[in-house]
């Protein structure tokens, strides 16, 4: 039988620390969150592998390094209100919930949203709200957000998300075509929005009014 805690520890050391993930809070969150509970039973032994895994409905759970990179880029301190676009399995939301005060997560697929919510509730997370909606529209009723994380690729950054980012906030989003994207960090400041390229990635499509057509 696999010792999943040891598997997580090994994942953190060999995949995250070795590639420059240095935020201690991010590393501890990823040591703690039971990644194997967010994948199908048949894939549990692969849960900590260095690649994405299918979660059904043509969606995936991102590889651990990408989860860590995106999370670290938000520079969370613990007091933040976060918007996540693309709940998927719920794993990224769980990691964020370990590091921030509240997480508002949007998933357009009702089946995925239901399964993710069930898993998160079983694990006892009280600071995550999952909603079925078009993520490209954001969550206006709860805006502004200190941080926004988008877990799907978009041809351009949805304007509603930029509008809902608090001053001093940080947004991480994959931007590009359907085959490959660049991971972009947007920082909102008094002089406007600063964009930084964090490197090449490949995500499933962000479908919605301000993303790709379904």
Curated annotation (Swiss-Prot):
GO cellular component labels: cytoplasm
Catalyses which reaction(s): [protein]-L-isoaspartate + S-adenosyl-L-methionine = [protein]-L-isoaspartate alpha-methyl ester + S-adenosyl-L-homocysteine
Record's subcellular location: Cytoplasm
GO BP field: methylation; protein modification process; protein repair
Molecular function, one GO term: protein-L-isoaspartate (D-aspartate) O-methyltransferase activity
Keyword Ion transport appears in the UniProt entry: no
Domain of life according to the entry: Bacteria
Keyword Coiled coil assigned: no
E.C. code: 2.1.1.77
Alphabetically ordered keywords of this record: Cytoplasm, Methyltransferase, S-adenosyl-L-methionine, Transferase
UniProt-listed InterPro entries: PCMT (IPR000682), SAM-dependent_MTases_sf (IPR029063)
SUPFAM superfamilies for the chain: S-adenosyl-L-methionine-dependent methyltransferases (SSF53335)
Any Pfam family: PCMT
Active site: 62
Family: Belongs to the methyltransferase superfamily. L-isoaspartyl/D-aspartyl protein methyltransferase family.
Stored HAMAP family: PIMT
NCBIfam families tied to this protein: pimt, PRK00312.1
Its job: Catalyzes the methyl esterification of L-isoaspartyl residues in peptides and proteins that result from spontaneous decomposition of normal L-aspartyl and L-asparaginyl residues. It plays a role in the repair and/or degradation of damaged proteins.
Protein name, entry field: Protein-L-isoaspartate O-methyltransferase 1
Species: Syntrophobacter fumaroxidans (strain DSM 10017 / MPOB)
Gene from which this protein is expressed: pcm1
């Amino acid at each position: 039988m696999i010792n999943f805690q040891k598997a997580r520890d090994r994942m953190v050391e060999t995949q995250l620390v070795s590639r420059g993930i240095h935020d201690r809070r991010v590393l501890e969150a990823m040591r703690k969150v039971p990644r194997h509970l967010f994948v199908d039973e048949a894939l549990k032994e692969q849960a900590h592998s260095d690649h994405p895994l299918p979660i059904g409905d043509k969606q995936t759970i991102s590889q651990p390094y990408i989860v860590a990179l995106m999370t670290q880029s938000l520079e969370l301190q613990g007091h933040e209100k976060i918007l996540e676009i693309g709940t998927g399995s719920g794993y990224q939301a769980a990691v964020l919930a370990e590091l921030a005060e509240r997480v508002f997560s949007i998933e357009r697929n009702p089946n995925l949203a239901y399964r993710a919510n069930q898993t998160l509730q079983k694990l006892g997370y009280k600071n995550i709200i999952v909603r079925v909606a078009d993520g490209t529209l954001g969550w206006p009723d709860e805006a502004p957000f200190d941080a926004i994380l988008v877990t799907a690729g978009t041809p351009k950054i949805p304007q509603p998300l930029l509008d809902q980012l608090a001053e001093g906030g940080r947004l991480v989003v994959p931007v590009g075509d359907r085959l490959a994207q660049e991971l972009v960090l947007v920082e909102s400041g008094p002089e406007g929005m600063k964009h930084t390229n964090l490197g090449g990635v490949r995500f499933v499509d962000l479908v919605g009014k301000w993303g790709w057509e379904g």
